[in-house]
Amino acid sequence: MAHETTSGRRLPDPTSPSDPTRRTAAIRIPFPARLNPHAERARQHTLQWVQETGLLTGDEATAEYDTLRLERLMAYFYPDASAGDLELAADFNAWFFIFDDQFDGGLGTRPHEIRGVVDALVGTMTTDGAPRPADVRDTPLVRAFRDIWLRSTAGAPYAWRLRFRDHWQAYLAAHVGEAHHRNADRLPSLEQFLEVRRHSIGVQPCLDFTERCGGYALPDELYRSFPLREMREITGDVVIFVNDIVSLVKELAAGDINNSVVIEREHKGCTLEESVEHITALANARTARFARLAASLPGTLADLGVPAPSREHVSHYVDGMRHVMAGNLSWSLATSRYDETGIAAVSGGRRRPWDGLTTATGTASPRHPRRA
């Protein structure tokens, strides 16, 4: 049996017994995953925050959200973060996934409407730390994003705030590009897909937060240097490929084609299992390249005369990339988002209970911007 996307494209059967999405044993991420000991505190904090901001309403929606254990993804990403920083990261991650789920239905194929959503969110990202006046027409998504933006940038160096803003703008704008991919008569090539997905995966803002948790901001010339630039791209690609393998059945059930496994199957004319093997090989080649770059980096920095404190910050930053790759895999295999429960939640036209937030206004808002 085949399934259709919202644009009528035929997709493979997501209920096939030869399910390739759990075949992650061949993925080689040679970095250990560690869990932050403050994970449960972050969970309790964020459950309260998503209700205060109006992102979730009602016990049923909150219970369904809680089964995803999204705070654990951040606890893997930032295993050494303070309790306050982890709470803020968990809030951002809650917003990220709730926002992502808005595009599982018809909105995901309407780029002009998405542009309006993006513009409203971009307008909240002031770099001077001054909050934009609230608008009575603001949605819970906008109000919640404003809250976490202000908390994240409070006291941060100006150059870091600019990078953080640029990465979030690119993340938001990429949803317009993904809508165009869904509407196109032909699937994009893998490279065309990655040009957009490298932004919509949201890894770059997460790596910015690695700096924040470490209490430093890399100088621009060091941040943009060749080794770190390529290592960031590798980190994002590995997260993309792992996500696409693990979430394949869920995305087929929802009718979404923005998945590297689906794209490679279409262009190579192979089976889903063969496509999974190919994407796995791409991920493994990238982690091997990352390891080689990381091994040569200390000597490169010393030869360039980079001061010792900056070298320590780079070491922390590189560890942060390792945490993101390893933590994403560990969390993805444990969350209910991609198991049978998560697949059923988006099958047969069903949407998550937090769908529709791009137009809902509501009245809930945080009592005050928390500082972390």
From Swiss-Prot:
Pathway(s) served: Secondary metabolite biosynthesis; terpenoid biosynthesis
Organism: Streptomyces pristinaespiralis (strain ATCC 25486 / DSM 40338 / CBS 914.69 / JCM 4507 / KCC S-0507 / NBRC 13074 / NRRL 2958 / 5647)
Residues reported in the UniProt entry to bind substrate: R197, K250, R337, Y338
Protein name: Pristinol synthase
GO biological process, one term: terpenoid biosynthetic process
Record's function text: Catalyzes the conversion of (2E,6E)-farnesyl diphosphate (FPP) to yield a new 5-8 bicyclic (pristinane) sesquiterpenol (+)-(2S,3R,9R)-pristinol via a 1,11-cyclization, which requires the abstraction of the pyrophosphate from FPP to yield the humulyl cation. The only accepted substrate is farnesyl diphosphate (FPP).
Keywords assigned by UniProt, alphabetized: Lyase, Magnesium, Metal-binding
Top-rank lineage group of the source organism: Bacteria
Cofactor note: Binds 3 Mg(2+) ions per subunit.
Residue ranges of the region described as Disordered: 1-23, 349-372
EC number, as in UniProt: 4.2.3.182
UniProt feature, compositional bias: Basic and acidic residues: 1-12
Alphabetical list of PANTHER family matching this protein: BETA-PINACENE SYNTHASE-RELATED, TERPENE SYNTHASE
Pfam families (UniProt xref): Terpene_syn_C_2
Notes concerning its domains: The Asp-Asp-Xaa-Xaa-Asp (DDXXD) motif is important for the catalytic activity, presumably through binding to Mg(2+).
Binding site for Mg(2+) 1: D100, D104
Residue ranges annotated as motif DDXXD motif: 100-104
Cofactor: Mg(2+)
GO molecular function: metal ion binding; terpene synthase activity
